[in-house]
UniProtKB/Swiss-Prot annotation:
The lineage of its organism: Bacteria, Pseudomonadati, Pseudomonadota, Betaproteobacteria, Burkholderiales. Forms a cylinder of 14 subunits composed of two heptameric rings stacked back-to-back. Interacts with the co-chaperonin GroES. Its EC number is 5.6.1.7. HAMAP family: CH60. Keywords: ATP-binding, Chaperone, Cytoplasm, Isomerase, Nucleotide-binding. GO terms for cellular component: cytoplasm. Transmembrane segments: none annotated. It comes from Cupriavidus taiwanensis (strain DSM 17343 / BCRC 17206 / CCUG 44338 / CIP 107171 / LMG 19424 / R1). SUPFAM superfamilies: GroEL apical domain-like, GroEL equatorial domain-like, GroEL-intermediate domain like. It holds the Pfam family Cpn60_TCP1. GO terms for molecular function: ATP binding; ATP-dependent protein folding chaperone; isomerase activity; unfolded protein binding. It is an enzyme of class 5 (isomerase). InterPro entries: Chaperonin_Cpn60_CS, Cpn60/GroEL, Cpn60/GroEL/TCP-1, GroEL-like_apical_dom_sf, GROEL-like_equatorial_sf, TCP-1-like_intermed_sf. This is Chaperonin GroEL. It is found in: Cytoplasm.
């Protein structure tokens, strides 16, 4: 085991604070509409230019072990805020730096760090309650567009695209971000349910121009096992042929004789059919088959429920208005399922989302809800160069998270004003002793910091602007983009409540940990000894005798 350096008290804290300041100073220049860019070196390819706080934070690794500990703790604030709320990483970093900086002064003056922490926690609790009171629900598409624009560093077109996508697929719908092919941003909406399985044979294609299988008003057969024997399928095929409608078979697999017979029937025009594999794997496959059954008003034919292929009737089959099958995707449009049944299924999946422990499971369940409830929207980001594309895509993703957060918990005035207004609830707070009161003061001072930084980045005098905004009431604040004072909500400068709340809570949590740290243990840096000199040309002394 490597030897360790153990550092106590002020010496440990001072080094960690240096690390906090290095990271926070690099991140906070990106805050606000006039935030500056940060250039990140890449080991391959060109450098990346970003205004995204968490991207900057993730790049920073310091040589000094103790400084690095401080930096990593603040990086945790940014990452945690990004994971929970999807935005607000720079605000959280600025708040954490301020709480650490002010707190260290009181610790150095001999105050009890544990009481300071209690005071900080008390103040943050009161501020969060006040933020909830200030918060208003997002109701209009315009508000959603404004939140998106602010989060995308004041890019109105991104906000509008996201609002448009939410209008099309609903607030629960899946919205994904992809690289576009042109210079302009595009929005593509897939109505109905889409899953990532294509046709099993190209011979099913009936629209050669688009290279897709298009089935109008088809029946849908759902089976949870492989189909290889055509005899099992014959009774159903005969009933469908009599009805004179197309058939889509969704099963674990369709192979051999069964697939060959379907293809031959299709080519001869006896029965218009297509077959695709069921989406997902294992238990998720069963759940998704059940989703499709509810959407199309059919039944999954499974031995567990006592149903077999030979005994299946038209009543067991689902129906849809139209189904399109490409090489890699199948889209079911306007399934014949019962609205109440679909709503019940959505509620059931939402309950599973609440209980899900892994992010992957939660994401997959949310996709299932969206597929049942609305549809899928794809925002294709356009840019002139790859560097610009990466930077813009990161901003669109941030904006998307922010708008989701706004829909979830509502909005507050942006530009650092919500935190200033929430100070009203703290100013009258009293702790149990003088040290706790000092903790409350630390938070009061920190809550001015985001506005100060926004103003500094805009090149104005912070103290003057903060004093003027404090004099105002409600939504009155400073719009750094235009340099004007006024009602920020009317100007469209909005922040999601969830983002502001999460930033404050995470910043206070990590900063309190740092204030109550009294010892740091780090690996002793290895001293690299200089390599030995190469051997000389010794032993050549007896050469005279050879002359």
């Amino acid at each position: 085991m490597a030897a360790k350096d153990v550092v106590f008290g002020d010496a440990a804290r001072a080094k960690m604070v240096e690390g906090v300041n290095i990271l926070a100073n690099a991140v906070k220049v990106t805050l606000g509409p006039k935030g500056r860019n940060v250039v990140l070196e890449r080991s391959f390819g060109g450098p990346t230019v970003t205004k995204d706080g968490v991207s900057v934070a993730k790049e920073i690794e310091l040589k000094d072990k103790l400084q690095n500990m401080g930096a990593q703790m603040v990086k945790e604030v940014a990452s945690k805020t990004s994971d929970n709320a999807g935005d607000g990483t720079t605000t959280a970093t600025v708040l954490a730096q301020s709480i650490v900086r002010e707190g260290m002064k009181f610790v150095a003056a001999g105050m009890n760090p544990m009481d300071l922490k209690r005071g900080i926690d008390k103040a943050v609790g009161a501020a969060v309650e006040e933020l909830k009171k200030i918060s208003k629900p997002t109701t209009t598409s315009k508000e959603i567009a404004q939140v998106g624009a602010i989060s995308a560093n004041s890019d109105a077109s991104i906000g509008e695209r996201i609002a448009e996508a939410m209008d099309k697929v609903g607030k629960e719908g899946v919205i994904t971000v992809e690289d576009g092919k042109s210079l302009a941003d595009e929005l593509e909406v897939v109505e109905g349910m889409q899953f990532d399985r294509g046709y099993l044979s190209p011979y099913f294609i009936n629209n050669p121009e688009k290279q897709v299988v298009a089935l109008d008003n088809p029946f849908v057969l759902l089976f949870d096992k492989k189909i290889s024997n055509i005899r099992d399928l014959l009774p159903v095929l005969e009933q469908v042929a009599k009805a004179g409608r197309p058939l889509l078979i969704i099963a674990e697999d369709v192979e051999g004789e069964a697939l060959a017979t379907l293809v031959v029937n299709n080519i001869r025009g006896i029965l218009k059919t297509a077959a695709v594999k069921a989406p997902g794997f294992g238990d998720r496959r069963k759940a998704m088959l059940e989703d499709i059954a509810i959407l199309t008003g059919g039944t999954v034919i499974a031995e567990e429920v006592g149903l077999t292929l030979e005994k299946a009737t038209l009543n067991d089959l689902g129906q849809a208005k139209r189904i399109e099958i490409g090489k890699e995707n199948t889209i079911i449009i306007d399934g014949a399922g019962d609205a109440a049944g679909i709503e019940g299924r959505v509620k059931q999946i939402r309950a599973q989302i609440e209980e899900a422990t892994s992010d992957y499971d939660r994401e997959k369940l949310q996709e299932r809800v969206a597929k049942l409830a609305g549809g899928v929207a794809v925002i294709k980001v356009g840019a002139a160069t790859e560097v610009e594309m990466k930077e813009k895509k990161a901003r669109v993703e941030d904006a998307l998270h922010a708008t989701r957060a706004a829909v979830e918990e509502g909005i507050v005035p942006g530009g650092g004003v919500a935190l200033l207004r929430a100070r009203a609830a703290i100013s009258a707070l009293q702790g149990d002793n003088a040290d706790q009161n000092a903790g409350i003061k630390i938070v009061l001072r920190a809550m001015e910091e985001p506005l100060r930084q926004i103003v500094l980045n805009a090149g104005e005098e912070a103290s003057v602007v903060v004093a003027k905004v404090i004099e105002g009431k409600g939504n009155y604040g400073y719009n750094a983009a235009s340099g004007e004072y006024g009602d920020l909500v009317e100007m469209g400068v909005l922040d999601p409540t969830k983002v502001t709340r999460t930033a404050l809570q995470n910043a206070a949590s990590v900063a309190s940990l740092m204030l109550t740290t009294d010892c740091a243990v780090a690996e002793t840096p290895k001293e690299e000894s200089a390599p030995a000199m190469p051997g000389g040309m010794g032993g050549m002394g007896g050469m005279e005798g050879m002359m």
